[in-house]
Amino acid sequence: MFGMGFFEILVVLVVAIIFLGPEKFPQAVVDVVKFFRAVKKTLNDAKDTLDKEINIEEIKKETLEYQKLFENKVESLKGVKIEELEDAKVTAENEIKSIQDLMQDYQKSLETNTIPNHLNEEVSNEEALNKEVSSDESPKEVQLATDNNTKEHDKEKENV
């Protein structure tokens, strides 16, 4: 303790006994021990407080790093999402335009009783079947077949 050996401590104790006397010496030892305990406690408290503050500073630094990382990721995601949304918007607009074109084609065909452009092949097949049916069947059966074709056309229109 304090760089003193056993012999030096013994000399200090003998001098203290001679100087203080046998009546005051025990009380002086108790006071010195209390003083060293208080100093030790104060130093430990200071050390703990310093450790906590250092730990808090480290946590603050880590928090700031995570915050910056999070903000960077959010910014990068904003850019990606905007690009993806633009792509989806363009695709949706193209699909809407395609559907509108089909609807206009159907409306024109209904107004003029002509066949829509995209159904020409299907209708020509149906006409060929109708011609075959008309040659083999009575007019009443041909009318039923035509009604069925009209119903199918209406169903397609509803689905679109």
UniProtKB/Swiss-Prot annotation:
GO terms for molecular function: protein transmembrane transporter activity. Its main location: membrane. It is found in: Cell inner membrane. GO terms for cellular component: TAT protein transport complex. It comes from the Bacteria. The chain crosses the membrane at residues 1-21. Keywords: Cell inner membrane, Cell membrane, Membrane, Protein transport, Translocation, Transmembrane, Transmembrane helix, Transport. Residues 118-160 are annotated as: Disordered. Residues 128-140, 149-160 have a biased composition (Basic and acidic residues). GO terms for biological process: protein transport by the Tat complex. It is a single-pass membrane protein. The Tat system comprises two distinct complexes: a TatABC complex, containing multiple copies of TatA, TatB and TatC subunits, and a separate TatA complex, containing only TatA subunits. Substrates initially bind to the TatABC complex, which probably triggers association of the separate TatA complex to form the active translocon. Belongs to the TatB family. Part of the twin-arginine translocation (Tat) system that transports large folded proteins containing a characteristic twin-arginine motif in their signal peptide across membranes. Together with TatC, TatB is part of a receptor directly interacting with Tat signal peptides. TatB may form an oligomeric binding site that transiently accommodates folded Tat precursor proteins before their translocation. This is Sec-independent protein translocase protein TatB.
